[in-house]
Amino acid sequence: GDRVAMRALMRSRNFDAVIHFAGHIVVPESVSDPGKYYRNNVLGSLNLIECCEESGVGLFVFSSSAAVYGNPATIPVHEETPTNPINPYGRTKLITEWTLKDFAERTGSNLPLRYVALRYFNVAGASLDGALGQATPEATHLIKVACEVACGQRDSVSVFGTDYNTEDGTCI
């Protein structure tokens, strides 16, 4: 994020909290271009966290991801499920969670940071004009793909995995 613009905005208003939804989210792209994800998701988040601190904003909601779990040993996952991200996207989300934890637990700060990290599974949504969200042709998210199949724009939905504890071994 643009730290100068963020700092100016935060100082011009009296914000109580920040809800951080920004970030790159395409897993295959994170594998092919990890630097893009670390620069945007980790450094951008750090800039925002530091701007919050400088501006006296002590409440922070972070849009993390279930990708921080990787391939969990047990299903369903819960808050105590061990994290083990398997791609750069998941790692950037976990690093940002750790960063928030470190700022929250830090000693000597005049402003204690209180935060929550929300670990979503399949997020859906887009602006009506298609400028934001999963309305792009290359988006691979389950809900978007399933809607495309239902509308006849795609032939099928791929289901990955065959070793789940279900009747047919799939995750469904």
Give the label of every model feature segment.
Residues 1-126:
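N-terminal Rossmann-like NAD(P)+-binding domain of SDR-like oxidoreductases, especially those catalyzing
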Residues 101-172:
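NAD(P)-dependent short-chain dehydrogenase/reductase
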